[in-house]
Amino acid sequence: MFKKFALPLLALLAAPAFAQAPVAAAPAAALPINAPESVTADASNRWTLELSNGGTVVVQLRPDAAPQAVERIKTLTRQGFYNGLAFHRVIPGFMAQGGDPKGDGTGGSPLPDVKAEFNALPHLRGTVAAARADSPDSANSQFYIMFVPRISLDNKYTVFGRVVSGMNFVDQIAPGEPPAEPTRIVRATLGG
């Protein structure tokens, strides 16, 4: 009887440890973007973040997978909303979160929340997705960038883009919740 339950029990106990183990980082450019040609060819679907750490990060937006989330990013970027905002929650080996004007994870834009657009895009290194509260339909202005793959988040958050350039600068975003000296978005722009 013990043998019948020992192996499955051991597998269950070990699974969380393996699921949360950091994965060796690969360059973002080496990972597939899973974007159709029509998306990658459109410069208006490039979101550029100039960071206070001296780097520039370029995100390929995916309106084919998350049209409402991408339109929200574009609208707020055109308004200058992201300029000066900090990455307020940065967990090494997991992700960097920004887009909150309050800087504590509780803020958002004055615009209404966006409904969830869960899609088939996976949480890989460089994935950019909409941060939200407990309700799936509570995304607003906050977003996060993955340092490592985390499949446990797939189909639970709206993935709307992928870093295609400057992942090394994402890796240099100051850690902390919040960081003592946070990395900021100096300027966010579209195109390029």
Regions found by a protein language model. Give the residues of each.
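Cyclophilin-like peptidyl-prolyl cis-trans isomerases
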Residues: 2-8, 18-192
